[in-house]
């Protein structure tokens, strides 16, 4: 008994001494205050797809709260928030998830193709940044706006389309814009009196952006599912908007799907792809598009480019045992010729 008490006493003394020693730093270097830089690397990231050069271009961020998903889910808001916290998703000053807005540039060697064009100078409470950063990212990546000859919007929401025009002038003067007929029917052709009050502002933004290109005959149309230009097939992913499309690129046996807004929050919708979002024009169709597309994407093991995935928005899908999906982002590596 005495031996046990002695052992406990010695252990306690050692713990006390150790804790006191660790409470104070061993060394204190002389202070050397250096101003923080508080800047980030330029907003682009590049990979090769066969012979095609693919560049992700950061345009800014939107603040998306779990409330936007709660009305389209069997999960409670608290459960949705838990999914977000589990992924350590960064938050904005207003408490929403800091959600990237990403466009993609594909240089095929024959054409310089921009998929989506960012928000430009459109103002909306969900946008974190006052102005889009697409052009700054594009120039940091070594390209100029006037070099782009083809623009493929996945749809005509402001964060994907308004960046084609700033203050009524074309940002991409030498580009032709290709729109699906299904998207055109709503955004460009619907009489204003037939639009809902909620839609009028968003439609006005889309029409203002398209106007200078329409005036100069720089807009062409296709049907969802068609090969839009050689080597680029449109993939119907309807629901988010009536003519929402992805675009599939293939080079030397490697394939990439640019899926636009198929997913808005990877923490929620990868685990529960049945969950829709308030921005969907037709949540039932959007849910169906996602549930149909994700298994096929995972099975084919193709590269994915997503507009609202964590930057650079490039990676692959794996099927999880619980029926959800795991997002596997690309890793940094140099471009080797």
Regions found by a protein language model. Name each.
Residues 168-173:
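Short, conserved loop/helix-junction motifs that constitute active-site signature segments
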Residues 252-337:
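Cap/insert and terminal regions of metallo-dependent hydrolase folds
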Residues 1-22:
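Gram-negative bacterial Sec-dependent N-terminal signal peptides
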Residues 59-60, 117-120, 156, 182-183, ...:
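Active-site metal-binding loops of divalent metal-dependent hydrolases
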Residues 21-143, 147-159, 181-236, 253-260, 328, ...:
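Metallo-beta-lactamase
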Residues 157, 233-247:
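Active-site glycine- and acidic-residue-rich loops that bind
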């Amino acid at each position: 008994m005495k031996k046990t008490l002695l052992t406990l006493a010695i252990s306690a003394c050692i713990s006390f001494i150790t804790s006191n020693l660790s409470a104070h730093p061993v060394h204190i270097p002389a202070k050397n205050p250096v101003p923080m830089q508080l800047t980030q690397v330029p907003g682009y990231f590049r990979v090769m797809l066969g012979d095609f050069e693919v560049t992700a271009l950061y345009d800014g961020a939107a603040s998306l709260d779990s409330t936007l998903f709660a009305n389209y889910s069997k999960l409670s808001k608290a459960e949705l928030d838990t999914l977000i916290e589990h992924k350590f998703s960064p938050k904005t000053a207003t408490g929403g998830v800091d959600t990237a807005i990403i466009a993609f540039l594909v240089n095929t060697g024959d054409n310089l193709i921009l998929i989506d064009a960012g928000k430009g100078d459109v103002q909306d409470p969900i946008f974190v940044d006052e102005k889009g950063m697409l052009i700054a990212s594009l120039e940091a990546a070594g390209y100029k706006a006037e070099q782009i000859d083809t623009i493929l919007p996945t749809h005509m929401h402001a964060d994907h389309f308004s960046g084609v025009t700033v203050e009524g002038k074309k940002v991409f003067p030498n580009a032709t814009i290709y729109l699906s007929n299904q998207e055109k029917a709503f955004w460009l052709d619907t009489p204003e009196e037939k639009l809902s009050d909620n839609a009028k502002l968003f439609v006005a933004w889309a029409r203002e952006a398209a106007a200078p290109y329409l005036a100069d005959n720089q807009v062409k149309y296709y049907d969802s599912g068609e090969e839009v230009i050689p080597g680029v097939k449109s993939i119907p992913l309807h629901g988010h908007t009536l003519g929402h499309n992805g675009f599939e690129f293939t080079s030397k046996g490697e394939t990439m799907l640019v899926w636009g807004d198929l997913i808005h929050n990877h923490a929620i919708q990868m685990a529960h792809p049945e969950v829709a979002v308030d921005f969907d024009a037709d949540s039932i169709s959007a849910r169906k598009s996602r549930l149909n597309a994700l298994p096929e994407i995972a099975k084919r093991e193709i590269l994915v480019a997503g507009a609202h995935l964590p930057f650079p928005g490039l990676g692959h899908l794996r099927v999880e045992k619980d029926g959800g999906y795991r997002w596997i982002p690309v890793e940094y590596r140099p471009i080797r010729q």
